[in-house]
Regions:
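Loop/turn-to-beta-strand initiation segments
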Residues: 92, 154-157, 190-197
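Conserved P-loop NTPase
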Residues: 35, 40-42, 151-157, 225-273
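Conserved P-loop
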Residues: 70-134
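Phosphate-binding/switch loop-helix module in NTP-utilizing enzymes
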Residues: 130-189
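Conserved catalytic-core segment of NTP-binding enzymes
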Residues: 169, 173, 180, 184-190, ...
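Intrinsically disordered, polybasic Lys/Arg-rich low-complexity tracts
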Residues: 3-37
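Pre-Walker A adenine-sensing motif
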Residues: 48-58
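Short hydrophobic/aromatic beta-strand immediately N-terminal to the Walker A/P-loop
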Residues: 65-68
Length: 273
């Protein structure tokens, strides 16, 4: 017995969309734009030639970087040298000091051949002396006058000296942590490339270093060690996100033109942890 197959007509079901035609077109356009946007990965010079060589051409643009070291290791010189590199390239730069006076910084840097007053008169360099009280006001205002300056003058590089002095106003651990996080959030919003100096001190380290080490994009540590009858300075790239960097420890000296890193004489020092 054979069965007749009945022809079944397939009635196509019309699919309806809650989106209007113009909405659909708009979404396609936005999606297309998103797929074509590529995140730029740029590097900028640290201002120290040999440091650029061991960090794939320097700092990542718009990153936050921290220089850690004890007294006399060269943190402030590093911070200014980083800005000098930008100034020589025509960039506008900002130095925020929480400790030293403007006259002291200018006098010290002039000995290295860096005429900061000249750049200031050209409208390319700005120096701000900030007390801890002013920092609190700035954080409460969400940026305040510094944000206005950064945005209107198109500041490319910012050095903050030092982040430890910045938090000295806050007594409680939670207040310090919140202040640091708020400051870093502001700095990221401005998209400038930032260099922070941080005092290496056991009492300060316990309170702030763990937060800073996690939040910043790179950490460079400066050491001043007594070896035999004299003190020698060393530099270590402890961390640098998105960069294949050297893990060696290099000696450096402070010369007439700033920090000079000795890449050829790399050393491993068992006393450094």
């Amino acid at each position: 017995m054979t069965m007749k197959k009945k022809a079944i007509k397939k009635n196509p079901i019309k699919k309806t969309s809650p989106l209007k035609k113009e909405d659909s077109t708009l979404i396609k356009t936005i999606t297309k734009k998103k797929t074509t946007v590529k995140k730029k990965y740029e590097k900028i010079s640290t201002g120290i030639k040999n440091l650029d060589k061991i960090t794939e051409k320097g700092f990542v643009k718009s990153s936050i970087n921290m220089i850690v070291g004890g007294a006399g290791t060269g943190k402030s010189i590093f911070a200014i040298q980083f800005l000098i590199e930008g100034l020589r390239k025509g960039e506008t730069c900002l130095y925020i000091s929480f400790e030293e006076k403007k006259e002291e910084v200018y006098s010290n840097m002039l000995r290295l051949g860096w005429d900061m007053e000249k750049y200031e008169n050209q409208g390319k360099f700005f120096f701000l002396e900030y007390t801890p009280e002013k920092v609190k006001t700035m954080l409460d205002e969400g940026g305040g006058e510094i944000e206005t300056l950064v945005l209107t003058k198109n500041i490319a590089r910012i050095s903050v000296d030092s982040i430890t002095a910045c938090t000295s106003l806050f007594a409680k651990e939670t207040e310090k942590r919140n202040a640091i996080l708020s400051l870093l959030e502001l700095l990221r919003k401005w998209t400038s490339t930032v260099l922070l100096t941080c005092e290496k001190n056991p009492s300060i380290e316990k309170k702030t270093s763990s937060i800073l080490e996690f939040e910043v994009d790179s950490i460079i540590t400066l050491y001043s060690l007594r070896i035999k009858d004299k003190r020698e300075k060393f530099l270590e790239v402890f961390k640098m996100r998105g960069t294949k960097h050297s893990t060696e420890i290099y000696p450096f000296s402070i010369e007439k033109k700033g920090i000079d890193l000795k890449c050829k004489s790399c050393k491993r020092l068992p006393s450094i942890k």
